[in-house]
Amino acid sequence: MTATAQQLEYLKNSIQSIEDYPKPGILFRDVTSLLEDPKAYALSIELLTERYKDAGITKVVGTEARGFLFGAPVALALGVGFVPVRKPRKLPRETIAESYELEYGTDQLEIHVDAIKPGDKVLVVDDLLATGGTIDATVKLIRRLGGEVHDAAFIINLFDLGGEQRLEKLGIHCYSLVPFPGH
């Protein structure tokens, strides 16, 4: 099933836009409103799964926290394992970490050292692509463990914030269901 314009418009309309959140001048795209609509949520999972069903994916990696909500169902539908990438000290086994830049400062993401095997073909899934910092760090973690990142898939792409270009410089193709301008 290829996504139709009508299906993509339905998804786009299920995402609420909140003005001045989390601070004045920001137009926040709230993917949780899509989650509240079972038809939209199921459709988003179905479209992502359909795109990657014959890609030979061996693991799906989701970034904390909303990436879990989309990545885990896609992994289940593809019949492959799901790997969470989390903030520091949230994973119980041995981990490796990667730092990334925030608007004011830095943060870190971690992954279990045994979650990705050399040669794993990985699909990274998150709810939204903005500047690409989180996914950049996630890709670096996967590669450090010997995994090959096949694609990065998103529900929303804030296309004018530079995330897609940043990931392309890493050799990562981005796929998203719903484009929005970023603010």
From Swiss-Prot:
GO terms for biological process: adenine salvage; AMP salvage; purine ribonucleoside salvage. GO terms for molecular function: adenine phosphoribosyltransferase activity. Its main location: cytoplasm. Pathway: Purine metabolism; AMP biosynthesis via salvage pathway; AMP from adenine: step 1/1. It comes from the Bacteria. Gene3D superfamilies: 3.40.50.2020. PROSITE patterns: PUR_PYR_PR_TRANSFER. GO terms for cellular component: cytosol. Its EC number is 2.4.2.7. It catalyses: AMP + diphosphate = 5-phospho-alpha-D-ribose 1-diphosphate + adenine. InterPro entries: Ade_phspho_trans (IPR005764), Adenine_PRTase (IPR050120), PRibTrfase_dom (IPR000836), PRTase-like (IPR029057). It is found in: Cytoplasm. It holds the Pfam family Pribosyltran. Keywords: Cytoplasm, Glycosyltransferase, Purine salvage, Transferase. Homodimer. Belongs to the purine/pyrimidine phosphoribosyltransferase family. Catalyzes a salvage reaction resulting in the formation of AMP, that is energically less costly than de novo synthesis. This is Adenine phosphoribosyltransferase. The lineage of its organism: Bacteria, Pseudomonadati, Pseudomonadota, Gammaproteobacteria, Enterobacterales. The gene is apt.
